[in-house]
Amino acid sequence: LSSKQETNGAIPTYFDSDLTPAEQLRFSATTGLNGAVLAKGARLTGNAEWKDVALEAGRFIKNTIIPSLDFSDFEAYYSCSPKPLYFMDNETGIKPHCNLSIQWCCDLMLELYRLTGDKNWLDDGEYLLNIMCLYQQIWDPPFYPEYLYGGFGVMNTDGEWNDGRQSRFVVTLVEYFEETKNLQYLKRAVAACRASFALMDIPENHDGNINQLVLGKQFAKGDAGCGKAVPGVGY
């Protein structure tokens, strides 16, 4: 990862077969994921090179991504909501967001704070975390039969209400609570964790009327458990 860093601090995530960085999303918020890995690795091992690369990645996110709120990754453009890379909302000028890249940037800022003790990184991380939390469901919509409170959507250009990534966000929220003691983050983590279990096809959820989702009926078998889940234990 460290050898692939660009001169502006970005670390590409997508490469051609010869390991040349793909031009699409070459300088994007996915840098947060790579930077977070290097920052944590530097903290655990004391590797000075990884630390320097992670700091450059953090400065790229701080100076380039945050001012424009350009939280782009592969899913924002090439998944179930395809659009051109130059797309933005005509009314607001807001670019497509995929909140996985927001989470990755949150993780990078937190790891840089833990690595350096510089509270400016933590402040930037909380700013990003607050943006990520805008995607959390803080009500249980009556027009869906499942219990959706506390779950997370995916993008600002698509219609998912709750998605499996909400279980990933639990750890990020808890770690920010541990560093800041902001109880809101812990409450949001608990709600997201509960929402993750609430979407499971298990007898407890059916008996408690939390959901009546049945694998193979309401959603495809191949969409759960890497295609290995069976009815009654699916997600």
Regions found by a protein language model. Give the residues of each.
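Glycan-recognition and catalytic cores of secretory/periplasmic carbohydrate-active enzymes
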Residues: L1-Y235
